[in-house]
């Protein structure tokens, strides 16, 4: 019973993450009935981006504690069928070393992005913590405007790592720029920008 509560909390965090990444969340996904939970595989979700219907994402919840290459291949096939270009795999423990290698290979070969999160990472939405400032992903146009306004090169911006927890939450990849808004006692708010590397 407690496991169901834990899974539904993780699912809630994933829905918030997808919403923050500007994916459309259906009413059914939001109001997922507790009674319809049978297995982790039932929690699988498919969403499309608000402004770009060709940009879609899958969220997989594997039943097995350790995820192997065969399961990764199965997920990639499912993605191909629906022409999804991104996926999040929420694992119970870890994925095998061969599966990690397969994730990297599929990402390079097939031009798809496979992200892996442990369940423990998604129990709490880190962006709701009071010490985590608001992060806003800039569009390409906003990024260009920022660089021209301050007459600077991309390499001169402060950096944020791709493996940073907030960068992973927002699905940032190399070259993305985020606007970070922090509260400030003197100025009201302090804005900074970071380049994902």
Swiss-Prot record:
It is found in: Nucleus. The keyword Nucleus applies. InterPro entries: Arch_Rpo5/euc_Rpb5, RNA_pol_Rpb5_N, RNA_pol_Rpb5_N_sf, RNA_pol_subH/Rpb5_C, RNA_pol_subH/Rpb5_CS, RPB5-like_sf. Its main location: nucleus. One of its GO terms (molecular function) is DNA-directed RNA polymerase activity. The keyword Nucleus applies. It comes from the Eukaryota. PROSITE patterns: RNA_POL_H_23KD (PS01110). GO terms for biological process: transcription by RNA polymerase I; transcription by RNA polymerase II; transcription by RNA polymerase III; transcription elongation by RNA polymerase I; tRNA transcription by RNA polymerase III. One of its GO terms (cellular component) is RNA polymerase III complex. DNA-dependent RNA polymerase catalyzes the transcription of DNA into RNA using the four ribonucleoside triphosphates as substrates. Common component of RNA polymerases I, II and III which synthesize ribosomal RNA precursors, mRNA precursors and many functional non-coding RNAs, and small RNAs, such as 5S rRNA and tRNAs, respectively. Pol II is the central component of the basal RNA polymerase II transcription machinery. Pols are composed of mobile elements that move relative to each other. Component of the RNA polymerase I (Pol I), RNA polymerase II (Pol II) and RNA polymerase III (Pol III) complexes consisting of at least 13, 12 and 17 subunits, respectively. In RNA Pol II, this subunit is present in 2-fold molar excess over the other subunits. This is DNA-directed RNA polymerases I, II, and III subunit rpabc1. The lineage of its organism: Eukaryota, Amoebozoa, Evosea, Eumycetozoa, Dictyostelia.
